């Protein structure tokens, strides 16, 4: 039940085609920079006069207004503004991007989908459409909750590899093993950490799972020597 249509938005015919489609559509999603759709006569205010039930979703890097709104960007840029890249650095301390484009997929696509679905439910009840403004950098920052909570708790930005979810705890870390592989331990709950310590024959480390700072370093070294 899907169709692919190409419309030349620089032509009057293309704009007219979009207007005809909008009249029968439930959702319109656009990813132009702020102001482009208005110049084309296809912005939210114009489209809602054609279809009052329309859900109109704009996905941009930095939102519809503000000092960065007119900047182009990619996932890597949004991750940096959200503080994600600063938590995943390479050996020379350069911020890096993970293999998963989290700002594009989590900040953009997933956040948009959730907003659109909620707006569709509302439209079924109210008969009115909604405008949804998705800023990928903003949504990516909302996903960076562990680093934000650490900053609030400890009064500063956690160093790379020192956040509670990125290596800052012995019980939630990765360890090089004697056979040249890696062992990932995700044993935040006491019962799981206790079982792990018993399994590697280090029951003395059971109280050390949540050690931080220098104590954390000593506990991590002890575990690494055991695996």
Go through each PLM region and give its residues.
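A structured beta-alpha segment of the ubiquitous adenosine-cofactor-binding alpha/beta core
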Residues: 1-49
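Active-site-adjacent "lid/gating" segments in soluble enzymes
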Residues: 38-188, 195
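Secondary-structure boundary/capping positions in well-ordered alpha/beta enzyme cores
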Residues: 25-28, 54, 127, 203
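Short alpha-helical functional segments enriched in proximate histidine and acidic residues
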Residues: 28, 119, 226
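Aromatic-enriched alpha-helical interface/lid elements that frame and gate functional surfaces
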Residues: 170-227
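A generic structural signal for short
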Residues: 6-7, 32, 108, 160, ...
């Amino acid at each position: 039940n899907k169709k692919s249509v190409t419309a030349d938005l620089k032509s009057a015919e293309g704009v007219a085609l979009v207007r005809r489609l909008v009249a029968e559509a439930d959702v319109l999603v656009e990813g132009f920079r702020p102001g482009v759709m208005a110049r084309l006569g296809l912005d939210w205010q114009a489209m809602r006069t054609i279809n009052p039930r329309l859900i109109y979703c704009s996905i941009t890097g930095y939102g519809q207004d503000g000092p960065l709104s007119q900047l182009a960007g990619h996932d890597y840029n949004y991750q940096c503004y959200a503080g994600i890249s600063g938590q995943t650095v390479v050996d020379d301390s350069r911020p890096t991007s993970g293999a998963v484009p989290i700002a594009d997929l989590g900040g953009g696509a997933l956040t948009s989908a959730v907003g659109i679905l909620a707006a569709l439910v509302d439209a079924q009840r109210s008969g009115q459409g909604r405008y949804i403004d998705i800023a990928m950098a903003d949504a990516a920052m909302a996903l960076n909750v562990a680093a934000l909570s650490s900053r609030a708790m400890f009064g500063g930005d956690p160093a790379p590899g020192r956040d509670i979810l990125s290596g800052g705890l012995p019980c939630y870390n990765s360890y090089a093993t004697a056979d040249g592989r890696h062992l990932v331990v995700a044993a935040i709950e006491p019962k799981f950490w206790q079982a792990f310590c018993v399994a590697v024959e280090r029951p003395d480390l059971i109280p050390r799972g949540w050690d931080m700072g220098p104590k954390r370093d000593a506990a991590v070294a002890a575990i690494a020597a055991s695996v």
